[in-house]
Amino acid sequence: MTDKDGNKQQKGGILALLRRPSTRYSLGGILIVGIVAGIVFWGGFNTALEATNTETFCISCHEMGDNVYPEYKETIHYANRTGVRATCPDCHVPRDWTHKMVRKVEASKELWGKIVGTIDTAEKFEAKRLTLARREWARMRASDSRECRNCHSLESMSSDMQKQRARKQHEMAREDNLTCIACHKGIAHHLPEGMTEEDED
């Protein structure tokens, strides 16, 4: 079918155009454009991913900057004799790509909380602290404290260099197959009020 100027009318619009081979562009040209577009997309995606994986990004929200960041700065993970600092993503974002993507999707819930103001005041944050802590402890238990083990390893620890109490606790942890978070809650942030015996395990 042609219009009054003799041009063919497209049936089905954009879907039809996508289904039929192009008479104007070569397959090679389309392929090159697709590859370049893919590289640009992947580069942009990876840049955004890394930008959201920094301590600066984490504390850019006043909820984190005003509540947990000041208490983290008082811990051994912030300042210590070796000069090695564990930042927010070191503990809260997995390093391997698959688990990192899962965590980023989970973080969208936190972004929603920011938008609706779930913890936008110190009082609201404290009211939710136990819930937030329990969620993070459960995540760490489920992953066998994977992020802790990026820096710490029971197998690499020299027990004869540890204090007697620490040596005994780590030996028990090995025997009972415990994960780091079972004993080290509150290592980087204040423990929430209202914890139960169940939370202590």
Curated annotation (Swiss-Prot):
The molecular function GO annotations come to:
electron transfer activity; heme binding; metal ion binding
| Residues the record lists as binding heme 3 | 148, 151-152
Q: Does the keyword Electron transport apply?
A: yes
Annotated membrane topology is:
Single-pass membrane protein
Question: Is tRNA processing included in the keywords of this UniProt record?
Answer: no
Q: Where does heme 1 bind?
A: 58, 61, 64, 110
Protein residues bound to substrate: 104
Topological domains on the Periplasmic side lie at 46-201
Q: What is this protein called?
A: Denitrification system component NirT
Q: Please tell me the species this chain comes from.
A: Stutzerimonas stutzeri
